[in-house]
């Protein structure tokens, strides 16, 4: 399959070396699918949704006395009342309500036993859970009017994990441990200590010998021994100890001289027993061999030895054998004993050691508890470790242990955990068993012993098979579960405390859904994973929603996360982007999904590969997880393959279990789908990424997310082909929902008419204009289709911010030169030509929102008004009669935006007083000015005003005017749509009638038509509707019926439109819902134009960032031989040490694109006779440089009109795509340089703009894509003379937000001391800071023109003395009288 030349709504020459097999999946599908599964909004059957599952797990709820049961029937979802837009304007949460149907059963009970018999009555009732935030179409949530994103969490998968660590105490001994991690419940650890005792530990509490755990689970000592050890039977004959001859015991070297019954040595110690010899011995009839005494002395019994006389247990299981015991047995005449064979392969003494350790602890317990049964004691021991200091009964201890691991309410492994357990331990317990079983514990311990003996596999906790993703649906499900658990507790408490008759009881008396709502809202508003959406530009939004965080509840803590967790892991390949992660303390903890990766239903990340069989690449594409990838040999996408899909080379570099190895082509199982699959969506936007150092690529992908939307957008000349994909999935670009034809298009609306099985429809796409984002940037959507265009489904019909013809465009193509210029580009600074400022190349608009609310207070209501006490009239000129600033006003700091007065707390005036006041309007004395002022450092134009009034309060003129405007817009929309339907109706009818023959004669105007003839379409279109009815009478009945059917069909469509319109109007008329206590809310939107300034931060896409240091007149900039000056000068020293050479290649290719564009423009200017033919040939020649494209066919078959449109686009620069790891290579560059008539090193001669002299060296000049970042100098610069002071210390506050001062710190004090500037220093530390009296005195002196008096004691001194007094030290300040003065007197 060849790669397409199309990218968005333009052509782009793509240099890919591998064909694009599959589409990049929707970038936001993880979040969308996850939330979809949570609610299942549109589906009929919702019982598989996460929401339903959570509710079913929490019910039924019983009380302890068996009187009541609450059961959950089902739930319905109630659609939201407000649109997203309204919620954002009014500060509400865009959410659904849930109607839960709950049944309360009251039981008849048996009075004696208290058991329930039959239901006395069942009552059903609906309980509402309000405010479950609903995901908007933009994949975000609106909470309290603010758009937020829930970041996906990457956490440790439930299941079992085996680890090894170096011992901290016993030298460098390796200690092994196993952890069983549930999704919910207690963690269980098994670990070795330095003495080889195996311990269990629950929830990081004190450790207990592992045998205690098994005994508490009702295993006898003998069971435990048989589970973990093979046993040997030893016969005692003639004071000798004999054992059956088993060749498998001697698989290694023999540990002792093996003797037969007669004492002959068969195998010498330290020698091997060959299979052949063993066979021979068996044939010779060797059955018993002697077991040496010294070996027997170190063994332990596997079964109890019974005293032959008394019948009592003589020696218990696990008793160590010694001389006296053996003697005793011989004396007793015991014939055989069973011993634990801990010398067998794959065993060790750890369980025996644990038995020895547990004997100690149980012996002490026996004395205190006075219980003999050791299994009960074991349970009590566990209870005491978990709940120290609490009294305990055997029953409580048993049930406690059962609850810990075997109760589905307290413990949940989840299906994923069960799957991982079964996979690791080789069990086949069914998926739905999500609690632990005894089998799990035994097999875990067995595997741990295996690991210690070097046979099992240690797990890597950072392997992506052991980490999984919890997306929004699951996170929200967990929160809901927490809320339900709280509610369950509350319900059970209520059930027990209810006294009196139960007959009156209803479900809502018990169920309080507030707890659920609170838990969910807390998660959305203050949870660690719920973040304020980064909305600087479309890319930052898309990547924010694709982010994976290892932090958050149940995740890591960033202070404790080590290096390993943060590092790139081999399994990240094709799953997680290795480049994009923040710098700083979160590095590596916050990641991004790779472009092609998907997340499966278990939460594991999958990467796509093509299947390879016998060195033959097939068409089968599989998505596999990191675990499934183990032992698979994977070839890179760049592997050479012939046209039949056979791998050409014999030996290729492949990936196998995280290592890169050379392997034969036959060994290969899979091949990468595309080199692009490694990187994430932001890194994939960097051309020539393969030539950049990783650190710089990281900065580049992070800085692209900070690019501000500019006034005019401009797609990159050198892109990567990813631009169209990002805008395809961002909501900012408007995409057609259904196919059709553009009926009307203007700056704010696009109407597309089409027809499907339901009838003719008109899709109306309203466009956002000047919408303020979370980061105060401005989003505007611009239509890119024309009237009459035929639109396909999913086609981009309007560009969002930072988009150009359906491609992402976050910056500008600028001509740059790499050279020093009078020292102005020292330390990465950037020199900019004045032309860029003049042409508004980097001008952006930022919109700020200020709001003010009038509240109801105890002593009256605040009012928004124009008459404000003690304010001059000229300060109110820009306000309207309601006291709100007028639209279009240019506001500056300190201007009043909204006038508001608030009543002073005063005694209630008498009715007479009130009357007088009403007559004379003497209000001023009793109210205080609380107006909204324009803050410092904000100036701009008021672009929008929103006024919301609470129900029952009178709307002011401003609110009424806004309503009228909105209504007028809706009415005109409706009118337009009706006209379109009308037009379509006449077209259809005319088309139909013109094809039918007349049944009678008819006259239209002055022309007569005979029966049997046809009337042409144009004539029918010219007849008005009422006359047409008469004309139709002249056709046959069938035709008349069809005509009526068409009329009715369109009538129905018009009715539908009318209903929709009325619905919209009713929404417009409904009252504003405001938070309680607020009577009126006014929002003012101020737009500021920010031109590029000295101090603004700019960057390229390769991590090459800098600050604008100088804006130079165009005339002084260096210029080329044809007189064109460059636009930006960058420092060449920023390249070699940073190793981001990608920018140099980008500059070369950008120059080629622009030069070729100029050649095409020249063709347009000259317009020869066969101009189109030449243009087509030129475009084919350019596109043919990249081999893997369908350029020839596409361009040669394209219609002339289309070709001209695309040619016009290319005349402003031919667009190239250099995809990640597949950029333009040397031969392609050579061809392109030749086509563009550029010298082969891409450099050119420049002349100094100031002197006109030729530069000595040739300079690298070309086009680079430059971005203006969100760090604008206007928003950072800040100055204060006087302002607020901190309360306790009385020093000026800090920070721009608080209008604070600059801190004169310790080191600054040293500087003044060094200069000996004592007076200035004293002033700095007193009256300029916190000497309250001194400040006031200085102010008085300055106003009177006197000299500033001496300063007093700084407030800090008083604070210090107070703190000393609080410590109990009596510190007082005394003023000393100056002796010098007294002498003068």
Curated annotation (Swiss-Prot):
Gene Ontology cellular-component annotations: DNA-directed RNA polymerase complex
Gene3D superfamilies: 2.40.50.100, 2.40.50.150, 3.90.1100.10, 6.10.140.1670, DNA-directed RNA polymerase, beta subunit, external 1 domain, DNA-directed RNA polymerase, subunit 2, domain 6, RNA polymerase alpha subunit dimerisation domain, RNA polymerase Rpb2, domain 2
Organism: Sulfurovum sp. (strain NBC37-1)
PANTHER family associated with the record: DNA-DIRECTED RNA POLYMERASE I SUBUNIT 2 (PTHR20856)
Taxonomic path: Bacteria, Pseudomonadati, Campylobacterota, Epsilonproteobacteria, Campylobacterales
Classification via HAMAP family: RNApol_bact_RpoB
Protein name as catalogued: DNA-directed RNA polymerase subunit beta
SUPFAM superfamilies to which the protein is assigned, alphabetical: beta and beta-prime subunits of DNA dependent RNA-polymerase
EC number: 2.7.7.6
UniProt entry keywords in alphabetical sequence: DNA-directed RNA polymerase, Nucleotidyltransferase, Transcription, Transferase
